[in-house]
A protein has these predicted regions:
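SAM/dcSAM-binding transferase cores
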Residues: 152-204
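Conserved SAM/SAH-binding loop
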Residues: 94-101
Length: 204
């Protein structure tokens, strides 16, 4: 498996056993497949080793998928694996969310944004909301919904409201997951996202 080979050199993921990779990475990612319209454009923010973006593409996601990853080694892995697998309509952007979210080619251009093991929810909201269009969806992949309370102000500032919450168990495991879907009710203010590093240092 490419992920295991590259992980030995570049530490792409802390999950190293092949069964755990299939369950905790692929199984977790694919639980989104039924919840997203595959004809919608998608950006996977802080994708790391390509989760959930690459499994969604392998499963047949039809529209454009952009994998956003700031780490150069991880971005190189993503280029290699997408080329090796011959995946179409999938693109790699090596950049910080706070920077890419201000670029015209990415800002409010997507129907869906996803984020997995990236940051606390009140930070993720500022990372991900700038990429989605009005009426678009941001999906936060979490273990539970306890972070919603601390994210209320960020949601208000970025014009997001909870659309639905899906609590599931990853197949072939007892691992609980909670996918929180947010809908963007209007376009965000020009001041968001704030400068590189600020959302993490001073969450809304």
């Amino acid at each position: 498996m490419l992920l295991i080979e590259w992980n030995k050199k570049f530490n792409l993921t802390g999950i190293t056993e092949i069964r755990d990779i299939y369950i905790k990475h692929f199984g977790d990612s694919l639980m989104l497949y039924k919840g997203i319209d595959g004809t919608k454009s998608l950006i996977d923010v802080g994708t790391g080793a390509g989760f959930p973006g690459i499994p969604l593409k392998i499963a047949g996601y039809k529209n454009k998928v952009v994998l956003l990853e700031a780490n150069g080694k991880k971005a190189s892995f993503l280029e290699h694996v997408t080329d090796t697998l011959g995946l179409e309509q999938i693109f790699i952007c090596q950049d910080r969310a706070e920077i890419a979210g201000r670029e015209d080619i990415y800002r409010e251009r997507f129907d869906v944004s996803t984020a997995r093991a990236v940051a606390p929810l009140n930070v993720l909201v500022e990372y991900c909301a700038p990429f989605i269009k009005k009426d678009g969806l941001f999906i936060a992949m979490k273990t539970d919904k306890t972070e919603l309370e601390s994210a209320k102000n960020a949601m208000k500032q970025l014009f997001l409201e909870v659309y639905k919450i899906e609590s599931q168990t990853i197949p072939f495991s007892d691992i609980k997951r909670c996918n929180i879907y947010f809908k963007k009710i209007k376009n965000i203010l020009d001041k968001y996202p704030r400068a590189d590093g600020i959302p993490k240092k001073k969450p809304l």
